[in-house]
Design a protein with these regions (language model features):
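A short, aliphatic-rich beta-strand micro-motif
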Residues: 113-124
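Regulatory sensory and allosteric helical modules in signal-transduction proteins
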Residues: 17-18, 47-48, 54-64, 69-113
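Intrinsically disordered, low-complexity terminal regulatory regions
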Residues: 1-74
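Structured loop/turn residues at beta-strand edges in well-structured enzyme cores
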Residues: 44, 110, 126
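Charged/polar positions on well-ordered alpha helices
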Residues: 42-43, 84, 119
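A generic "structured core" feature
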Residues: 41, 78, 122-126
């Protein structure tokens, strides 16, 4: 049975309040963000690149290359681990990682194998 555990930062309440204050969730596409994801895909040689924001229940894609969905349940988000630290979070092979090997995005389309994420941090230090 897949592990559908949410990873919660100790400052989650404050982090969510900060995220809401930006009024960016569910906003329209913006060329500036799309250029970043397109460039990341080219530089990293990966088929997928995302700018994601995590609210209480979901991972929402502000910008995306290589996927046709706009959000996932937070429990499936690799990014929930990314926001737990202030540095690069990397998974070499998701099929071998206990946290992700049963994730439906690893066992099925888009068949994620490698993941690298870096937290977006605001001026107050919230990821």
């Amino acid at each position: 049975m897949p592990d559908r555990t949410k990873v919660i930062p100790p400052n989650e309440r404050e982090r969510l309040r900060a995220l809401e204050s930006y009024e960016i969730l569910n906003s329209l596409r913006e060329d500036e963000f799309d250029r970043i994801t397109e460039l990341a895909t080219l530089l990293c040689g990966t088929p997928i690149s995302l700018i994601t924001l995590l609210d209480e229940k979901r991972q929402w894609f502000k910008s995306k290359v290589g996927v046709d969905i706009d959000e996932t349940p937070r429990e499936l988000a690799f990014c929930q681990y990314t926001i737990m630290q202030n540095e690069l979070f990397e998974v070499e092979d998701a099929t071998q990682d206990e946290r992700f090997k049963d994730n439906e995005f690893v066992t099925g389309p888009p068949d994620i194998r490698f993941y690298a994420g870096f937290p977006l941090t605001d001026a107050s230090g919230y990821n």
